[in-house]
């Protein structure tokens, strides 16, 4: 699916897992109703949560389970507007629960379909989580100006001017021997020497 930048938050792939399946189910159900095709009815039955009605896991709670099945994708879609990674996680969790229930109840067709959807949602969650970690790492390491001392220590430094005392740079109240000065990610060279040093990338 190719979406514009403005629609990217509303047309998220994770919600399509639910909505596309529900849409196809509804259209197939209408088609079967118009043609009286019992085999199509059975096929649809095997691919919806109705298949779990006869299992021990759901037989006593089918009514609220159906309501949850309908409302769950709505909630996750709304959640995706502000918390996309979290909504992917809940998609994988919900689809995985239905798949597990189908497997335990011996409904292997239902289990395989929802298991594939759960896996796709989980992959989306992993991708989003990895991107979030990369963004967090960049946010914490975006400083490009720093000083490397002779012991390999890295000290953040914003100014191109370094004040020396006794041949050492004063950083945070401590005196360190400068090995390299990096400005905007580039190794700098001393420009002028006075009572202080000015470095230029």
From Swiss-Prot:
Show which residues sit on the Virion surface side of the membrane. 33-63
Q: Where are the transmembrane segments?
A: 64-84, 109-129
Q: Which GO terms describe its biological process?
A: clathrin-dependent endocytosis of virus by host cell; virion attachment to host cell
Give the membrane topology, semicolon-separated if more than one: Multi-pass membrane protein
Main localization (coarse): virion
Q: Which InterPro entries match?
A: Arteri_GP5
List the signal peptide residues: 1-32
Asked if the record carries the keyword Translocase, the reply is no
Keywords, ordered alphabetically: Clathrin-mediated endocytosis of virus by host, Disulfide bond, Glycoprotein, Host-virus interaction, Membrane, Signal, Transmembrane, Transmembrane helix, Viral attachment to host cell, Viral envelope protein, Viral penetration into host cytoplasm, Virion, Virus endocytosis by host, Virus entry into host cell
Recorded superkingdom: Viruses
Q: Which GO terms describe its cellular component?
A: membrane; viral envelope; virion membrane
Q: Give the matching Pfam families.
A: Arteri_Gl
- Does the record carry Heme as a key word? no
Cell compartment(s), UniProt: Virion membrane
Using the UniProt annotation, give the residues that carry a glycan (glycosylation sites): 37-38, 46, 53
Coiled-coil annotated spans: none
PTM comment: N-glycosylated.
Q: How does it assemble?
A: Heterodimer with the membrane protein; disulfide-linked. This heterodimerization is required for transport to the Golgi complex. Interacts with host SIGLEC1; this interaction plays a role in virus entry into host cell. Interacts with glycoprotein 4.
Q: Which family does it belong to?
A: Belongs to the arteriviridae GP5 protein family.
Describe the function of this protein: Major envelope protein present in abundant amounts in the virion envelope. Mediates virion sialic acid-dependent attachment the sialoadhesin receptor SIGLEC1. This attachment induces virion internalization into alveolar macrophages predominantly through clathrin-dependent endocytosis.
Q: What is this protein called?
A: Glycoprotein 5
Q: Which organism is it from?
A: Porcine reproductive and respiratory syndrome virus (isolate Pig/United States/SD 01-08/2001)
Per the UniProt record, the lineage of the source organism begins with: Viruses, Riboviria, Orthornavirae, Pisuviricota, Pisoniviricetes
């Amino acid at each position: 699916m190719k979406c514009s930048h403005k629609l990217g938050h509303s047309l998220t792939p994770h919600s399509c897992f639910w909505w596309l399946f529900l849409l196809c189910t509804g259209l197939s159900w209408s088609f079967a109703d118009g043609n009286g095709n019992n085999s199509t009815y059975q096929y649809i039955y095997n691919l919806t949560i109705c298949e779990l009605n006869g299992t021990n896991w759901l037989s006593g709670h089918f009514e609220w389970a159906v309501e949850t099945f309908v409302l769950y994708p709505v909630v996750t879609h709304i959640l995706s507007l502000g918390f996309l990674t979290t909504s992917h996680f809940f998609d994988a969790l919900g689809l995985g629960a239905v798949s597990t229930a189908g497997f335990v109840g011996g409904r292997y067709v239902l289990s395989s379909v929802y298991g594939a959807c759960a896996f796709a949602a989980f992959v989306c969650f992993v991708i989003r989580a990895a991107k979030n970690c990369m963004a967090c790492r960049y946010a914490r390491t975006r400083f490009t100006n720093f000083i490397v001392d002779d012991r390999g220590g890295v000290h953040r430094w914003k100014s191109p001017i370094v004040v020396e005392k006794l041949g050492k740079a004063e950083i945070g109240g401590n005196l360190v021997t400068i090995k390299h000065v990096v400005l905007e990610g580039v190794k700098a060279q001393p420009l002028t020497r006075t009572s202080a040093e000015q470095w230029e990338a």
